[in-house]
Amino acid sequence: MITEVAYARTMADDTRARGGAGGPAHAVHLVEQSLKSAALDSGLEWESPEPGSFVVTLPGTRKLSTTCSLRVGRHSLSVNAFVVRHPDENEGAVHRWLLERNLKLYGVAYAVDRLGDVYLSGKLPLSAVGEDELDRLLGTVLEEADGSFNTLLELGFASAIRKEYAWRVSRGESTRNLDAFTHLTRPAENPGPA
C-alpha cells in the first residue's frame, strides 16, 4: 500500500519531469517573465540565444556594462558574469581582495577561470527562482561588477593605467575616463631640501 507521503513525492517528481512547478521548464518561464518585466520597467537588455539560456546586459557607471549569463539546468539556475581579465600585477593582492569580498556577497562569489580572468558565479536552486530572487541576484552582480571595477583596476593594472595616461598626455588626447585614477597618475611630489 502506498502512503500519502510516497504518493505526494511521486506526483511532485512526475510534475517536475513534465516541466511543471519547480522544474526546468517552469524556471525558464519564470526567468523569461522576470526579464521581460525588467525590460519594461528599466530598459534592461536581454536575449535568449537558446532555450533555457539567457544573456543579460547590465548597465554600469564605472564599468560600461556587465554581460551576465543565466542558464537553467535540471536542478539549478547558474549565473556567470565576466568582471575583469587576468591582473597584470599584484595577483596575490587581487585574489585576497576577492576572497575577502566573497564573505559579504549574496548568491554569487568571485571566481577565477583557468586563464586567471575574474568572474562572478553562482547557482540558485530551481525552487528558489522567482522575480524577486532574480532581481536580487542580478542586483548583486551589477553592484559587485560595477562597484569593484576601479578597485580591481587599481590593484591589478596600476602600471598599465600609468602608461595609458602618459601615452594620452603625450598625444594630447583626453584622459577624462582615467579621472578616477588621478592618485595613480599625478607626478610624485618632491619634498624639496630639508
Residue ranges of each PLM-predicted region?
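Charge-rich, low-complexity N-terminal segments
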Residues: 1-65, 113
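Hydrophobic-cavity lipid-handling domains and compact docking modules
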Residues: 50-88
